[in-house]
Amino acid sequence: MFPSWSTTFVLCMGLCSLMNGALAQYDEGASIEDFEFRSACTTANNVCERMADTCCPGLQCIGCNPLDPDDDGHCSCQ
């Protein structure tokens, strides 16, 4: 049948405490250098330079066409 409300509550609280512990361990591993890097890699309006690696990890500086004479070299992090 269905578990009682008290059993459901205890299971939920147990899972919540496990998740909080996992998040705390993740945060302990992050250093101030990691935080500074993540802050520094955020670009204004997702604009990046073609020749500079300013996008955050997981994003690429794309949207430029170096063969286009009207291309100003500004791309977007996507």
Curated annotation (Swiss-Prot):
Locations listed in the record: Secreted
Single GO cellular component term: extracellular region
Chief place of localization: secreted
PTM per Swiss-Prot/TrEMBL: Contains 4 disulfide bonds.
Keywords: Disulfide bond, Secreted, Signal, Toxin
One MF annotation (Gene Ontology) recorded for this entry: toxin activity
Domain of life assignment: Eukaryota
Signal peptide stretch: 1-24
Tissues expressed in: Expressed by the venom gland.
Keyword Aminoacyl-tRNA synthetase: no
Keyword Secreted included in the entry's annotation: yes
Family according to the record: Belongs to the scoloptoxin-13 family.
Record-given protein name: U-scoloptoxin(13)-Er1a
